[in-house]
Amino acid sequence: MHTQKAITEALQKLGVQSGDLLMVHASLKSIGPVEGGAETVVAALRSAVGPTGTVMGYASWDRSPYEETLNGARLDDNARRTWPPFDPATAGTYRGFGLLNQFLVQAPGARRSAHPDASMVAVGPLAETLTEPHELGHALGEGSPNERFVRLGGKALLLGAPLNSVTALHYAEAVADIPNKRWVTYEMPMPGRDGEVAWKTASDYDSNGILDCFAIEGKQDAVETIANAYVKLGRHREGVVGFAQCYLFDAQDIVTFGVTYLEKHFGTTPIVPAHEAIERSCEPSG
């Protein structure tokens, strides 16, 4: 049974330091049995960064109608009328991004951003700075909490989570100067007048596949491709927390690498020939 003290010490050994800004992507199952459960993991993370540090997570929303309204799809009138508007104070988190986020949201002093589908949660001195503002059309790119996390010198922690979980790399996708980026439109239910739902349309980069070759089902997306290439450089930290294999990345460094990678292989005048770029960048290795 893993204790808070043991998890905190393992995080520190991995390279988490007092004062860090830490975005956590976690698989609680991978960590193994923890005395006190997920709340203990949150406490260990906060202990590792100390009172001057901030812990952040990608919460999203368990009622996000992203898929139901994607690229012109439309909910029926009854669903649109009865769908709850997004309320950062009460909304659940998307379980696909890990159960830990629900416990971060419930932590004392937690702040949550107002973008329903790309909602971020943060706990610590930088919580308000990170989460506000967060407008539709700025999900994970410029003007988002994700951008502020990168610019403020954050670290991305994969706590048993796979390499396709590095949310910071979606910022690299957004700012990289490459043609033919995929765009999506979708609708989100926002609070309206007198408690009514106000449906708002958003247009943004496609974080599920920034280019066509990264949007093929069963293939690596850009985030996983870039993260795998970055790990080979050895500029990150690896270790074990509980039973979980962990990676710790400097967000600015991996984002800079990601932007360069995308522009090198997919820019207007790519250094790598197009057919080789597809082979090297869009196909899974091995």
UniProtKB/Swiss-Prot annotation:
BP GO terms, sorted: response to antibiotic
Keyword Transferase: yes
Source species, domain of life: Bacteria
Key words, A-Z: Acyltransferase, Antibiotic resistance, Plasmid, Transferase
Protein EC: 2.3.1.81
Pfam families, per database record: Antibiotic_NAT
Catalyzed reactions: a 2-deoxystreptamine antibiotic + acetyl-CoA = an N(3)-acetyl-2-deoxystreptamine antibiotic + CoA + H(+)
GO molecular function, one term: aminoglycoside 3-N-acetyltransferase activity
Class of the enzyme per the UniProt entry, highest EC level: transferase
Family per similarity comment: Belongs to the antibiotic N-acetyltransferase family.
PANTHER family xref list: AMINOGLYCOSIDE N3-ACETYLTRANSFERASE, SPBETA PROPHAGE-DERIVED AMINOGLYCOSIDE N(3')-ACETYLTRANSFERASE-LIKE PROTEIN YOKD
Task performed by this protein: Resistance to antibiotics containing the 2-deoxy-streptamine ring including gentamicin, kanamycin, tobramycin, neomycin and apramycin.
Protein name: Aminoglycoside N(3)-acetyltransferase III
Organism: Salmonella sp
